Amino acid sequence: MPALRFLALLASLLATSRVGLATLADIVGGRRAQPQEFPFLASIQKQGRPFCAGALVHPRFVLTAASCFRGKNSGSASVVLGAYDLRQQEQSRQTFSIRSISQNGYDPRQNLNDVLLLQLDREARLTPSVALVPLPPQNATVEAGTNCQVAGWGTQRLRRLFSRFPRVLNVTVTSNPCLPRDMCIGVFSRRGRISQGDRGTPLVCNGLAQGVASFLRRRFRRSSGFFTRVALFRNWIDSVLNNPPA
C-alpha cells in the first residue's frame, strides 16, 4: 500500500443536492485489519475479482451502493462473506449469488439515493467471521468528534491490484462546512484517505453503519469522499427486510 500520508478527508453523508464527478473509493494507507474485526464486511465480486464492498445487515441482505451495479448485470456477480485473505480459500468464507436487488430512486446523474440492498440466494450462517452490522435510527445524526472507521480491500493505487487483506482507516468527525445544500459530515484522518476501489463499503461510527461509500470529489487539492447517509433510508431498508421480494 502507499506510504501513510497526512491529509484531510471530508467524507460526506449525502441525501440531496448535485455534487461532483463520481469515482470508486478505496482505503489508501491506514492499517491492516485484524481477522474477524469487521465480520459484517462483504466482498462483491465478478468472476472472482472484487469490484465493490458492502455490509451484511440481515442474514439475507447486504447493503451497498446502487452505483456499484450501474451498467452491470447482477446475475453475473457474487457476494463473499467471511473473507479475510483474498488469495486464500478460507473455510470461513460463504459465497452467494444475488437473487434480487432493491433500489430507492437512485439518480446517477445527480448522485442521489446511492443505496442498494442485495438479496442473497439463501440465508448467511452467522459465525465469528460472518455477523450483522447494526443500523442507525431513521434521521439520526453523527456529532462532531465521533470516531468512525472505514474498511475494505480497495486497490493499491500504484499497481491497481486489490489489497490481499482488508485495510481500515480510523477517522474523526469534524465540523468542517460542506457545500451549500449538501447534507454531510466531515471526517479527518492523518493516516490515509479514500480513493479508488471500495465503493459501497460502510462508514462505521460507534458500531453503527452510518454511511455507504458513494463517490469522490477533488477540489483545491483535497479529496472529499462522499457517503450516502444510511439514517435517511432506515425506514425504506426496514420495509425491504420485512417484506422481501418474492
From Swiss-Prot:
SMART domains: Tryp_SPc (SM00020). CDD domains: Tryp_SPc. Residues 1-19 form the signal peptide. Glycans are attached at N139, N170. It is a peripheral membrane protein. The keyword Isomerase does not apply. GO terms for cellular component: azurophil granule; azurophil granule membrane; extracellular space. Disulfide bonds join C52-C68, C148-C205, C178-C184. InterPro entries: Peptidase_S1_PA (IPR009003), Peptidase_S1_PA_chymotrypsin (IPR043504), Peptidase_S1A (IPR001314), Trypsin_dom (IPR001254). Its main location: membrane. This is a neutrophil granule-derived antibacterial and monocyte- and fibroblast-specific chemotactic glycoprotein. Binds heparin. Belongs to the peptidase S1 family. Elastase subfamily. This is Azurocidin. The lineage of its organism: Eukaryota, Metazoa, Chordata, Craniata, Vertebrata. The gene is AZU1.
